[in-house]
């Protein structure tokens, strides 16, 4: 499987409403989105690609209460760290957000992921 399909499976186990990039309008709460933010290409001195990829991944959680969204992002951090499909390291604590147009609380955390190419 690809890192993205492994990530989707891992996140769906914590929240069945998990989507790449953005959730469809009207999605029930809570929900999770994930988006790749680039990363550093890995290679060797002879310019051949390494067998691993380095990806910066943003995980965004949304819920109707601050406590619910904090619990969800913390549960996700725990399973990301424990994953055997890839190596994931948080790049800081989650950032809190509040969406005025949807009245949803958000929690956004970035991870550094190393996975097989």
PLM regions: where:
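Small/polar-rich, solvent-exposed N-terminal microdomains that initiate assembly or binding
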Residues: 1-47, 67, 71-78, 83
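Generic serine detector
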Residues: 2-5, 60, 64, 83, ...
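Sterically constrained small-residue positions within well-ordered secondary structures
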Residues: 25, 48-50, 100-102
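Short secondary-structure boundary micro-motifs
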Residues: 43-45, 52-55, 96-97
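Short, surface-exposed, polar/charged, turn-prone segments marking secondary-structure boundaries
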Residues: 46-48, 59-64, 84-89, 116-117
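Oligomerization/assembly interface segments of phage tail-like spikes and tubes
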Residues: 51-64, 69, 105-115
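Acidic-leaning, charged glycine-interspersed low-complexity segments
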Residues: 78-117
């Amino acid at each position: 499987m690809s890192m993205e399909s492994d990530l989707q499976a891992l996140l769906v186990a914590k929240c069945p409403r998990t989507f790449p990039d953005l959730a469809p309008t009207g999605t029930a709460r809570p929900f999770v989105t994930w988006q790749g933010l680039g990363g550093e290409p890995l290679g060797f001195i002879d310019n051949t690609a390494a067998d691993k990829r380095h990806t910066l991944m943003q995980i965004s959680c949304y819920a109707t209460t601050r406590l619910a969204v904090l619990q969800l992002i913390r549960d996700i951090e725990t399973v990301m760290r424990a994953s055997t499909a890839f190596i994931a390291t948080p790049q800081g604590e989650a950032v809190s957000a509040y969406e005025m147009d949807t009245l949803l609380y958000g929690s956004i955390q970035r991870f550094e992921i190393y996975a097989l190419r």
